[in-house]
Each structure stands twice: as structure tokens, then as C-alpha cells.
């Protein structure tokens, strides 16, 4: 059974996750964003376990583009758990997931993630990272990931190679928040006092 402190933590983590997924373009109901701690506990019950929070979400504009959120029970996640998750994903044709871990992954589990990365895209966040939404603390401008077609148009319009664009590291906290992958180009829109808005592009490396 989870302690009062753990319930409070998980409530905050869940809230950050829902905000993050909405920012990535997934369908998140308003009620999921405005849920209070009391509603959260009522929904999941006093005997809530981490695995009760497992969720499957789809993109707003594409129902088939789905993502799982897993909350492993063990503090250090090993290969066995990873295999269980990927088998579940495979059987349901879901190729992307977020793991919210209490501490970390074992070295073997890390290796497992890179070995399956061509088929499954698994993102790992520690619970501590998700207690606060980074966007509430840093002034984060709007980020839009370009589609392959939009990226091609952009490069042709400016006659540049993608590698000539300014870069953003895939490990950057903001890149992780938006779930960016290497090779993608992200459009960043900042408010500008003179031009109304100021647009830049970054290449994810």
C-alpha cells in the first residue's frame, strides 16, 4: 500500500505527464488536467498501486499513433520488466512508451532499450524529474515538431542542409519534454516585441 507521501508524489507526477502529453499533441481531457489530489485518490482508491496508473494515449489528429505510460513497481527496473512491457506493446501495435521509474534502470535494461530502439521508442523519466513541470519554471516558447514533408520544404526554401541549422541535444530537458528524436527539426516560436513573433528552427542531434 502506498503512503500518503507517495500518493502526493504520484498525483504531481501524473499531472505533469498529462500536461506534457497535451503539449506533444496527445488527446488529454480537461478533467485529467484539472483533477485535484482528492479526485485522484478517489479515482484510484486507497489501495492504489503504481501499475494502476498505466495509461494508453493517442494523438489528437491520429488515433493509431499511440503511446503507453508505464509505472514500474520495482525501484530499479530490470530486463524482465522491460520485456514484459515490450511484449504488451508488440501485441497491441504500440511502438512508443514512457517509463516513469522510481530510481533508475539496471545497466542491462539500458542496453535492452538501445537494442530494441529501431522498433520501440522508450523514454525513461525518473519520478523526481516529473514532480514539477519544467515549463512552469523556465520560460519555454512554443515548440512544434516538423513533419518529414515540412522539414523537406524548409530545407529547400532556405537551401540549407539540416546539419547547418542550429542544434538542440536530444538529452536537453526541453527536447526530452517534447519527446524529440535525433534527426527531427523543431520550430520554436517566441513572442517578439517588434515582429509579433520570432521563429527559429533547431535540428535535434
UniProtKB/Swiss-Prot annotation:
Chief subcellular location: nucleus
A GO-annotated cellular component: RNA polymerase IV complex
Key word Cytoplasm present: no
GO biological process: DNA-templated transcription
Presence of the UniProt keyword Transcription in the record: yes
GO molecular function: DNA binding; DNA-directed RNA polymerase activity
Family in the record: Belongs to the archaeal Rpo5/eukaryotic RPB5 RNA polymerase subunit family.
Function, as annotated: DNA-dependent RNA polymerase catalyzes the transcription of DNA into RNA using the four ribonucleoside triphosphates as substrates. Component of RNA polymerase II which synthesizes mRNA precursors and many functional non-coding RNAs. Pol II is the central component of the basal RNA polymerase II transcription machinery. It is composed of mobile elements that move relative to each other. Component of RNA polymerase IV which mediates short-interfering RNAs (siRNA) accumulation and subsequent RNA-directed DNA methylation-dependent (RdDM) transcriptional gene silencing (TGS) of target sequences.
This protein's name: DNA-directed RNA polymerases II and IV subunit 5A
Species annotation: Arabidopsis thaliana
Lineage: Eukaryota, Viridiplantae, Streptophyta, Embryophyta, Tracheophyta
Amino acid at each position: 500500500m502506498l503512503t500518503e507521501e507517495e500518493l502526493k508524489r504520484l498525483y504531481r507526477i501524473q499531472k505533469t505527464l498529462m500536461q506534457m502529453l497535451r503539449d506533444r499533441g496527445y488527446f488529454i481531457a480537461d478533467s485529467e488536467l484539472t483533477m485535484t489530489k482528492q479526485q485522484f485518490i478517489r479515482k484510484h482508491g486507497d489501495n492504489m498501486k503504481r501499475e494502476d496508473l498505466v495509461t494508453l494515449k493517442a494523438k489528437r489528429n491520429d488515433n493509431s499513433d499511440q503511446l503507453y505510460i508505464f509505472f514500474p513497481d520495482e525501484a530499479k527496473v530490470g530486463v524482465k520488466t522491460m520485456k514484459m512491457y515490450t511484449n504488451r506493446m508488440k501485441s497491441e501495435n504500440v511502438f512508443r512508451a514512457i517509463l516513469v521509474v522510481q530510481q533508475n534502470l539496471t545497466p542491462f535494461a539500458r542496453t535492452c532499450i538501445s537494442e530494441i530502439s529501431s522498433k520501440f521508442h522508450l523514454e525513461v523519466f525518473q519520478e523526481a524529474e516529473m514532480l514539477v513541470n519544467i515549463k512552469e519554471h523556465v520560460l519555454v516558447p512554443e515548440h512544434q515538431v516538423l513533419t518529414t514533408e515540412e522539414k523537406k520544404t524548409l530545407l529547400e526554401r532556405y537551401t540549407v542542409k539540416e546539419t547547418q541549422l542550429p542544434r538542440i541535444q536530444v538529452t536537453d530537458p526541453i527536447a526530452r519534454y517534447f519527446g524529440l528524436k535525433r534527426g527531427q527539426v523543431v520550430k520554436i516560436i517566441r513572442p517578439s516585441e517588434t515582429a509579433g513573433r520570432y521563429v527559429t528552427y533547431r535540428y535535434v542531434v
